[in-house]
Curated annotation (Swiss-Prot):
One Pfam family here: RGS
Record's compositionally biased regions (Basic and acidic residues): 201-214
Biased composition (Pro residues): 1460-1469
Region (Disordered): 1-66, 182-222, 449-473, 708-761, 978-1004, 1258-1327, 1410-1513
Gene field: loco
Residue ranges occupied by any PID domain in the UniProt entry: 247-423
Protein name: Regulator of G-protein signaling loco
Protein source organism: Drosophila melanogaster (Fruit fly)
Length: 1541
């Protein structure tokens, strides 16, 4: 009999069909989804064999069904053959591209590759097959097996019996990614083939009523006898397995746990080493902090324990698959591979055939790689002594290396331990150890017990979530492959081992072996940590009374199976809402427990006579509320919002929040009590806490809705954020409860203790503030529950044992934590808070002759809390004289700056005058003295005394008065943890679901208090009043601009104690921090650095995050004004700033003006361009916007983002003129310019001459006005080919205000800068050196555009001509300042000649109709305004007239549009000689000047050799080519001029 087990295709594109021996393939294969496995129908042979599909099989020897082998020939296409292969030995076709040669040849996803071109590849590695196919050209001939079978093996023979007794049923594989709703819908609605059972096999009778669902097989292939309840069968099978607890040998080592990564289903033995090392490499790249655990290696199992003795994970020896270190060079890391059995059949609806009571299931084995690291810092005995005490280890010396065996120095020792312990005997398959469990549990299945459903929360492979990180247990994104069972390691302190053992003792006879899963991951077989805790009331109702003599364990729970009738709505859940249904043969407590990634747990109260309960840890105290009824466990709000919709008036409380509410139980089916766990990270209570809480665990709790979907309606989230980013990309920020329960709670005068635990899966700086809603009656409950002031335990941030962590939680310094030396190692601040610790530490300092430090620090603490100013003055002088003065009696070691700062402020007696010195001393003690103290014999003696319950050497009762401080909340919050050496001494965020929860260099307590004061000035909260929701709203409402909640504030976790009080708190720490909100809503706390600009700070942040923002603005939160990026970053200290993306593009105006435009990305193009056109007096109707490069018109209704980084041009639709580089308008569209009447010109010229004589004396007399008005405006900010005539006009109009802005001529200046230069910018070069000859500064060509519009405004033209003549007079005067006019200027005929020349030039510049002009014979020292293209070669001062294509690339791009004719030749005789270094001006910004000194060609050796100090004269080339193309009319005054900015 052949049994066919084709593996499930990974990404099949078409449905594949199982082939049975002698039977036709089934015709109704379920259609496959586009991206998922193709469901495979089952066909039954006439002989009655059923085809079970197995996703993965152990492969032994290749054996093929030769009826299913075919030979195909595939030709290589343009893009290859069109198929992908996966796996190896043999490889499998995993994806067939549609319309590819592979599809045309008939290849199907799931087929196995047997041979290629006659070469058998069934046993070759994957890489070899890939190379063989990839190197083939033309066509390849392949042998394809439609099914792949293993040879008969022991494993298969053992399963044969079971197969013969299981009837065939129409079963389908469940989809691997249930969150594809369309695919799920198709799958659920696809037709199913009903098969009649073969007559040869007698139906197995069900022991349950027909109403109860039947059971699918659980294990891979355990043998099943007809009588399932025989104790002898159980004993026989269990005898094959080693009994748990029979180990006599045990090895224990301390290791660090990094994380778990799911491994491929099909992993061959040869690739295990490579796979393990890749897992190690991935986790190392994520730079995770290890969790220190105790690995106990026994012959039966390998377990991981926490420092409190709680079992974190247990793996039976049968499940340990492989162990290896990372490499020989880096031997600190090692990986442990475990296997787990699971059933791939999710609760699909099905109809039992007549007489059939069981259906074939789909069994598969998955592997998990757990990565560990050896802490080499703990090798020395003195270094790990404290850690050994935490784990209650007695160190065992190695006589050879003289090192402790419990703290190995490399991973090879642990690897060899594991190998030697488990490889000396032949281990059975992973499923073999569970046959007894199955035989015992099958009866329960036949009795109709509901099956426990559990799936591991895998990190999602969704494109918006997945990054380059591994798929290890990151605690985010539960929506992916349900079939992967991950052996997650849960770092939680459970109840003491005694209670757990007592609870487990009732799970079944001691002969029962451990199940395949880790014992519920916590040592109890019947519990599974599921993704969403959701009990099913139908499970309780279906549960029959106990009928079996055996108290059997709920095996199905540990095997993670799902089964429910077709009518159960829960079968349509997404993967992250899988239910956990616990039912046994008697009504049991519902013990639905969420997965460790979920953090919100829902468990039954512990009872030692029940086997289905977790031991209840200590939990956060809650107010009793008897008025509420427990909701029915199957209320839809506990399920996915995708299926049931968002519940009304409820907010999504995902795995970051717990709303713990206690109520009485009123449900008819709920006869057991329920309770709610606190967050898994926060169950760090001492044993006495757990005991006291267990006693009161009969109180009833109601778990708030735990929808896994992101709360997209939350106002705190940006509307444009991706749902995945908003839900999981950053730490979710949920809103507090707003349902009736919360309202009623407020009416009762209580506030729900909502814990918001941000999952720190983003970068270390991505931190969110937790909203802490605190109990108003906290003080009364403090002594009862022995909890901290704010009942929020710290996330595991210290390496201390749970007792120390418990102590570290008590922010107010409760009495039970005093005199506890083990807590001192966890925190320097905690030790100072403890009177015994203070006294012990001071005695230690006295032995080191540095006790003055602690005395100074405590004196400063007392001083800071003084109310009276007079007392402060006296106390300040006393402290200064004793510790800081030059002749002080007990001087402390502070730097001179802190000492001088204190001395300067001594008279003021401000509360914080000693803050700098105190901070230095505190850091000195914390990072120097305290470190030695922890390793000192004095501290060890204190710890030993504590462990032996002996009195401490220094009890603190007789503490020196000078060492006493007021450790109330306000004082304690200021115990600095600045610049903590967290990397060496703390484990900050060891598992990914509580990633780093403290700001790197600031204590969370300090930050929250300071942020309260710095960012949200508000009415003071009473000193000792808890921060209730009402007061929190009051605080937040005071300053909405800095609302910590609306802005999704980014401090990850705070000790709640700082929320109240905080009086006298110095804001020094927070003032070196600022919060930066990025465009995607992510927030970060960034430290400002002295000497760093705002721009550098933002660039540093963006670079760290690997973000590229080409253009952005930085604005204060709530403001619209952008911050200058050149300002020092200190202006951001204590502030909240937002980085806003901007769109930037360049805009060419019709006249040669280039504007750089920066806009918000949400605007449309016309909204951006219209104000610009209005500013420059253009109308939208008269212009058209085109792309400068392609000349394609642009639709202005498009978003402005389409122009990002582009170059746009504005062209006149019907213009009289078109000037500018790159003009696309033909010359014929430019009309000839009407020359001005002769009378106007004469009048203007005479007026100019009269006025400039009067202004000359003023200009010379005023030393200030000359550099501003007369000196060259050519500076580093302006290009040389621009005229300053109208810049001066604008300046005068700005100063005098006599010329309206609307009347300024449309003479747009060209600018090649990347950004629009300020028109009012003044020169720096000329002003800085007013003694240079004015002629040198002013000698330059002036471009004057004479248009009809200019002629209309004669006042402006007059002003321009007047300044031109002024410059002309300066030019004629030579390098020496001489106020006598030259004789030739006194000749009136010269002026008439100038006017005549002007007329001639204007006529000659008209390209259409030229007005003839008579040349004059008079000498021409006056302004020569004629230049045409034909005159260019005459110039003796010709400037390197190279074609524009010869320009350097960088220069050409920016100057090609601004080219113009070259300057005029120099004037004869009186012209000052230009020196060789003429025009040495350093361009700034993006301006590139064509005429650099290297390109300057001296006109003559004489001119080149003349000395001079001229710095800002650059000849102009104003767009020769473009001028001709546009037919533009320009007149060039060959006078000195200034360029605009």
């Amino acid at each position: 009999m052949h049994h066919h087990h084709p593996p499930l295709p990974i990404t099949g594109a078409s449905g594949s069909t199982a082939v049975g021996t002698g039977a036709a393939a089934a015709e109704d294969a379920s259609p496959a989804a586009n991206s998922g496995p193709a469901p495979i129908s089952t066909s039954t042979t006439p002989s009655g064999s059923n085809s079970q599909q197995h996703q993965r099989r152990r492969k032994k020897r290749a054996n093929y069904n030769y009826n299913g082998i075919r030979t195909v020939e595939v030709r290589r296409g343009y893009n290859g053959f069109g198929f992908t292969i996966s796996g190896q030995q043999p490889c499998r076709l995993s994806c067939i591209i549609s319309s590819s040669p592979a599809e045309q040849a008939g290849l199907r996803s799931g087929d196995f590759l047997i041979s290629v071109n006659g070469l058998n590849v069934s046993k070759l590695p994957h890489e070899t097959v890939v190379q063989l196919i990839g190197n083939s050209f033309g066509s390849i001939r392949m042998q394809i097996a439609e099914n792949y079978y293993s040879d008969s093996s022991d494993e298969e023979n053992a399963h044969a019996t079971l197969r013969g007794q299981l009837l065939a049923a129409s079963l389908r594989h469940k989809p691997r990614f249930l969150h594809h709703k369309a695919k799920l819908h198709r799958l659920r609605n696809s037709p199913q083939k009903k098969l009649n059972p073969p007559e040869a096999v007698e139906p197995h009778k069900s022991k349950s009523s027909p109403d109860h669902p039947t059971l699918k097989p659980v294990l891979e292939d355990p043998p099943l006898t007809a009588n399932l309840s025989k104790a002898a069968d159980v004993a026989n099978v269990s005898a094959m397995v080693r009994a748990v607890g029979s180990a006599a040998l045990e090895c224990r080592v301390i290791v660090g746990y990094l994380g778990t990564i799911e491994m491929p289903k099909q992993i061959s033995h040869s690739s295990k080493l490579q796979t393990v090392r890749s897992c190690i490499r991935k986790l190392r790249q994520e730079k995770r902090q290890p969790t220190i655990v105790l690995m106990c290696i026994t012959p039966d199992s390998l377990s991981l324990q926490s420092s409190s003795g709680g079992v974190l994970a247990t793996y039976s020896s049968a499940r340990l698959n492989f162990v290896s270190s990372s490499s020989e060079s880096e031997n600190r890391f090692f990986g442990l591979v475990t296997s787990a059995v699971h059933n791939t059949q999710i609760e699909e609806e099905y109809e039992p055939s007549a007489g059939s009571a069981a259906a074939a299931g789909h069994i598969s084995i998955s592997h998990s790689c757990h990565v560990f690291v050896i802490d080499t810092k703990l090798i020395e005995h003195a270094q790990h002594l404290q850690r050994a005490h935490e784990f209650r280890l007695q160190c065992t010396r190695d006589p050879i290396s003289n090192l402790c065996l419990e703290f190995p120095n490399n991973s090879e020792y642990v690897v060899n331990l594991v190998r030697s312990m488990y490889t000396m005997r032949i281990l059975p398959p992973a499923s073999r150890s569970h046959q007894a469990d199955y035989e015992a549990g099958a009866g329960a299945a036949a009795a109709g017990g509901a099956v426990a459903a559990a799936h591991s929360p895998q990190p999602s492979n969704h494109s918006e979530i997945s990054t380059t990180t591994s798929n290890s247990d990151s605690g985010i994104g539960f929506n992916n492959d349900c079939t992967n069972i991950s052996d997650r390691i849960l770092v939680v302190d459970f109840l003491a081992a005694g209670a757990g053992a007592a609870a487990a003792a009732h799970a079944g006879p001691p002969t029962y072996p451990a199940p395949a899963r880790p014992l519920g991951i916590v040592g109890i077989p019947d519990n599974r940590l599921t993704v969403r805790a959701m009990p099913d009331h139908s499970a309780l109702l279906r549960s029959p009374p106990a009928s079996s003599s055996l108290r059997r364990p709920n095996l199905l729970a540990s095997f993670n199976l799902i089964q429910s009738p077709a009518t159960n709505l829960t079968s349509t859940r997404s993967c992250d809402d899988v239910l956990n249904l616990f039912v046994d043969d008697s009504p049991r407590t519902l013990a639905a427990v969420a997965s460790m990634d979920d953090i919100s747990l829902h468990s039954a109260a512990p009872s030692l006579d029940e086997g289905h309960t977790f031991a209840h840890p200590a939990c956060v105290p809650r107010k009793m509320r008897r008025s509420l009824a427990l909701e029915t466990p199957t209320t839809p709000h506990k399920l996915s919002a995708q299926v049931f919709g968002q519940p009304g008036s409820r907010h999504s409380l995902g795995f970051e929040a717990i709303d713990s509410v206690q109520s009485s139980v009123s449900g008819a089916c709920m006869d057991q009590t329920m309770d709610t766990w606190a967050s898994l990270q926060n169950l760090h209570k001492s044993h006495k806490d757990r005991t006291s809480m267990s006693a009161s665990s009969s109180s009833h709790c109601l778990l708030e809705a735990t929808n896994s979907e992101p709360d997209l309606g939350n106002r705190a989230l940006p509307a444009n954020a991706s749902p995945f980013r908003r839900a999981w990309g950053q730490s979710s920020f949920r809103t507090p409860r707003s349902d009736k329960v919360a309202k009623e709670q407020q009416q009762l005068g209580q506030s729900s203790p909502v814990r918001r635990t941000a999952s720190m899966n983003a970068s270390d700086n991505d931190m969110y503030i937790k909203t802490l809603m605190l109990d108003s009656d906290l003080k009364s409950s403090r002594s009862q529950h022995q909890l901290s002031l704010l009942q929020v335990p710290k996330v595991l941030t210290t390496p201390a044992p749970p007792s120390a962590i418990t102590a570290s939680v008590a922010a107010e310094g409760a009495a039970q934590d005093h005199g506890c030396p083990s807590s001192w190692a966890g925190s320097f601040e905690r030790m100072l808070q403890d009177a015994a610790g203070m006294q012990t530490f001071s005695e230690f300092l006295k032995k080191e002759f540095s006790a003055e430090n602690i005395y100074f620090w405590t004196a400063c603490e007392r001083y800071r809390l003084l109310e009276s100013e007079a007392d402060r003055v006296a106390q300040a002088r006393e402290i200064f004289a004793k510790h800081l003065a030059n002749n002080s009696s007990d001087p402390v070691n502070v730097d001179s700056q802190a000492r001088s700062l204190t001395e300067e402020k001594l008279a003021d007696a401000a509360p914080d005058i000693f803050a700098p010195a105190q901070k230095q001393i505190f850091s000195l003690m914390k990072f120097d003295s305290y470190q030695r103290f922890i390793r000192s014999d004095l501290y060890k003696s204190c710890v030993e005394a504590e462990q032996k319950n002996q009195p401490l050497p220094y009890s603190g009762l007789d503490l020196d008065e000078l060492l006493k401080t007021n450790f109330h909340l306000g004082a304690f919050s200021k115990l600095k943890k600045s610049a903590s050496n967290a990397e060496d001494r703390r484990r900050k965020s060891l598992l990914p679901w509580h990633r780093k929860t403290r700001s790197k260099s600031r204590d969370r307590t300090e930050i929250m208090a300071d942020m309260q004061h710095a960012l949200m000035p508000a009415p003071p909260v009473p000193q000792n009043a808890p921060l209730t929701s009402a007061s929190l709203k009051l605080v937040c409402g005071q300053n909405s601009l800095s609302d910590l909640h609306s802005s999704r504030s980014s401090l990850s976790s705070f000790d709640a104690g700082t929320a109240t009080g905080g009086q006298g708190a110095s804001t020094e720490s927070v003032y070196s921090l600022c919060r930066v909100i990025l465009t995607d809503g992510a927030t970060t706390i960034v430290q400002t650095r002295p000497g760093e600009t705002v721009g550098e700070l933002v660039e540093r942040l963006l670079e760290k995050r690997n973000l590229v923002y080409p253009y952005y603005d930085i604005v204060f939160q709530g403001s619209t004004k952008s911050i200058d990026v050149q300002q020092p970053s200190q202006i951001l200290a204590g502030k909240e700033v937002v980085i806003e993306r901007r769109v930037a593009f360049k805009l060419d105006l019709p006249d040669p003006k280039v504007i750089s435009v920066k806009s918000k990305p949400k605007k449309q193009l016309h909204e951006v361009i219209r104000p610009i056109l209005s500013k420059y007096n253009y109308k939208m109707e008269q212009v058209q916007v085109i792309m400068r490069d392609t000349q394609v018109p642009i639709d202005l209704n498009q978003p402005v983002t389409m122009a990002d980084g582009q170059r746009l041009r504005i062209v006149m639709v019907n213009s009289d003129f078109q000037v500018g580089g790159g003009s696309s308008m033909p010359p014929k569209q430019s009309k000839p310019m009407k020359p001005l009447p002769q009378g106007h010109l004469d009048e203007l010229t005479n007026k100019v001459f009269n006025e400039l004589l009067a202004s000359k004396a003023d200009a010379a007399a005023s030393e200030k006005s000359r550099p501003v008005d007369l000196c060259s405006m050519k500076s580093n900010e302006a290009p040389s080919e621009t005229s300053s005539l109208f810049e001066r006009m604008r300046r005068q109009q700005r100063d005098g205000g006599n010329i309206p802005a609307s009347k300024l001529p449309k003479l747009k200046k060209k600018s090649t800068s990347s950004s629009q230069q300020s028109e009012e910018a003044a020169t720096t070069q000329a002003v800085a050196d007013p003694k240079k000859p004015i002629i040198a500064k002013l000698k330059a060509g002036v471009k004057l555009q004479v248009t009809e519009r200019v002629a209309e405004h004669q006042d402006e033209l007059l002003e321009g001509l007047k300044r031109a003549q002024l410059a002309r007079l300066e030019d004629q005067r030579g390098t020496e300042i001489n106020f006598d006019l030259p004789d030739f200027l006194k000749n009136k005929e010269n002026l008439s000649a100038a006017v005549s020349k002007l007329r001639k030039v204007r006529a000659s510049l008209s390209p259409v109709s030229k007005v003839p002009a008579t040349p004059t014979e008079i000498p021409q020292p006056a302004p020569r305004l004629s230049i045409t293209r034909s005159q260019q070669p005459v110039s003796p001062m010709k400037v390197d007239q190279e074609p524009e294509t010869d320009l350097p690339a960088a220069t050409q791009d920016q100057t090609e549009f601004a080219k113009a004719p070259p300057p005029l030749p120099p004037k004869p005789k009186v012209l000052p000689i230009k020196p060789s270094n003429w025009g040495v001006a350093q361009p700034t910004g993006n301006y590139c000047n064509k005429y650099s000194p290297s390109k300057q060609v001296p006109t003559s050796p004489k001119e080149a050799s003349k000395p001079g100090t001229f710095a800002s004269k650059i000849p102009l080339d104003l767009g020769r080519k473009s001028l001709e193309e546009a037919g533009s009319r320009c007149a060039y005054l060959d006078e000195p001029s200034s360029s605009f900015v």
